[in-house]
Amino acid sequence: MDAIKKKMQAMKVDKDGALERALVCEQEARDANTRAEKAEEEARQLQKKIQTVENELDQTQEALTLVTGKLEEKNKALQNKKKTTKMTTSIPQGTLLDVLKKKMRQTKEEMEKYKDECEEFHKRLQLEVVRREEAESEVAALNRRIQLLEEDLERSEERLGSATAKLSEASQAADESERARKILENRALADEERMDALENQLKEARFLAEEADKKYDEVARKLAMVEADLERAEERAEQGENKIVELEEELRVVGNNLKSLEVSEEKANQREEEYKNQIKTLNTRLKEAEARAEFAERSVQKLQKEVDRLEDDLVLEKERYKDIGDDLDTAFVELILKE
């Protein structure tokens, strides 16, 4: 039973370890899911940033197109003004030159301004392109990270499934062992109760045997007393017979005391009858004592047979209990080997 309890405790420890490993795997799976959700959220935010950068890039390209169009329009206007200047040669030279210089300065300033804006837009465009490339690289890194997290999640799920399967097997084995333990405990309790009952029966049989021995001793003692009384009665009967003989001789010798002799004879006859009755009574009591002694001997023999049978049953029950223990050890060894 101690070995069974130790094995059950070991199996409970294994079950607790499997439960702890399953909880750890579940926690790792939850952490992996959390990391995957966080990575997906970061990917969504980066996607939004990329969308924003693309929108800004489109706006920048549109602004660049507008600026380029305006620059072309200014160039066309400048060329038209040059043509107009050639056509208006009748205007005074000083005024015309001043106007042209002023227009040229304004045009140059506007061109410089548009060039600066164009360069600024180019820089912003390059910056947006760089930002877009960085965002794409971050997205690629996040995608790789998500893939690694998904692989880690799959491995965690596999470990969780394996741990769950092992936990289920351990639970089933523990349940089967628990059922087997309960069955064996019930059998052991039944065997113990039966052994207690047999021990009680054996004690009762021994007590009855002791009582029978006591009764036998008492009967033997009474029988010895009866035999002694019988011997004394026989002696008294012999003495009575001797007295009768003497009285008869006295009766034959003494004729004068006939009445007294007759009275003595009657008394002797009465005493003889009494002795005979006592002898019959003693014989009856002797037969009864012998019958009781025989009954006591038969009772002792029956009780001895019952004691022998109970001892044989006890030996058989011990052997059966030993066989059950061996079967239990074999079953636990098979369970351990299966694991």
Curated annotation (Swiss-Prot):
One of its GO terms (molecular function) is actin binding. Keywords: Actin-binding, Coiled coil, Cytoplasm, Cytoskeleton, Muscle protein. Residues 14-285 form a coiled coil. One of its GO terms (cellular component) is sarcomere. Residues 160-179 are annotated as: Disordered. GO terms for biological process: actin filament organization; dendrite morphogenesis; muscle contraction; oogenesis; pole plasm assembly; pole plasm oskar mRNA localization; regulation of lamellipodium assembly; response to hyperoxia. InterPro entries: Tropomyosin (IPR000533). Disulfide bonds: none annotated. It holds the Pfam family Tropomyosin. PANTHER family: TROPOMYOSIN. The molecule is in a coiled coil structure that is formed by 2 polypeptide chains. The sequence exhibits a prominent seven-residues periodicity. Tropomyosin, in association with the troponin complex, plays a central role in the calcium dependent regulation of muscle contraction. Belongs to the tropomyosin family. Homodimer. May interact with Unc-89 (via protein kinase domain 2). This is Tropomyosin-1, isoforms 9A/A/B. It comes from Drosophila melanogaster (Fruit fly).
